[in-house]
């Protein structure tokens, strides 16, 4: 059963991504018609944002890489950290890029031709990715480079939530 209508976009959302970042004087690497990469200055470190457009699915994918190279051998700590981080998310998820030994935030959005405010929607997805990476960077850093127990590393974040109740 296919409930999705067959929409054909009249544009490529990668162009919108390119326009959003170009307007703020960011350097972009347009790898091909459906991919672009941009490096943004973060609070803790630079982040690499990778965008890919999948035409058949009408899906714009965003990966935001945090430049934290893991030095720990115990992968169970890494995956426990990812699970704890993902429990707090409403959209997107954290993953681990094993080839580069670093965490990555991923999110995808379906874009149809008849949608209004596509630029605003894309900007919102970018903001969410950057904010989530900024929020979790210190925690990922102490787990991946110092070997701290993931639950201990998350404790200050849990206290923030309790303090706001």
Kindly give the residue locations of the regions a language model identified.
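Amphipathic alpha-helical segments
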Residues: 7-28
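Short amphipathic alpha-helical segments
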Residues: 9-13, 70-78, 121, 125-128, ...
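Short histidine-centered catalytic/ligand-binding loop motif
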Residues: 5-6, 63-71, 115-118, 122
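Short, intrinsically disordered, mixed-charge
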Residues: 23, 80-88, 127, 131-138
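Ser/Thr-rich, low-complexity intrinsically disordered terminal regions
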Residues: 24-47, 51-63, 67
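Short, highly charged C-terminal tails/helix-capping segments
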Residues: 141-165
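Charged, low-complexity intrinsically disordered regions
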Residues: 94-130, 134-147
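Short, internal acidic amphipathic alpha-helical interface segments
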Residues: 65-104
């Amino acid at each position: 059963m296919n409930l999705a209508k067959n929409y054909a976009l009249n544009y490529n959302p990668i162009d919108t991504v390119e326009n959003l970042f170009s307007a703020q004087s960011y350097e972009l690497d347009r790898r091909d018609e459906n991919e672009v990469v941009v490096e943004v200055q973060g609070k803790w470190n630079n982040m690499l944002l990778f965008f890919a457009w999948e035409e058949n699915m009408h899906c714009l994918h965003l990966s935001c890489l945090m430049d934290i190279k893991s030095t720990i051998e115990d992968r169970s700590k890494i995956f426990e950290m990812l699970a704890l981080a993902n429990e707090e998310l409403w959209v997107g998820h954290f993953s681990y890029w094993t080839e580069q030994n670093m965490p990555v935030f991923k999110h995808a959005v379906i874009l149809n031709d008849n949608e209004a405010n596509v630029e605003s929607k894309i900007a919102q997805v970018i903001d969410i990715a950057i904010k989530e990476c900024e929020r979790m960077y210190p925690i990922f850093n102490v787990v991946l480079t110092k070997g701290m127990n993931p639950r201990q590393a998350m404790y200050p974040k849990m206290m923030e939530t309790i303090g706001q109740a």
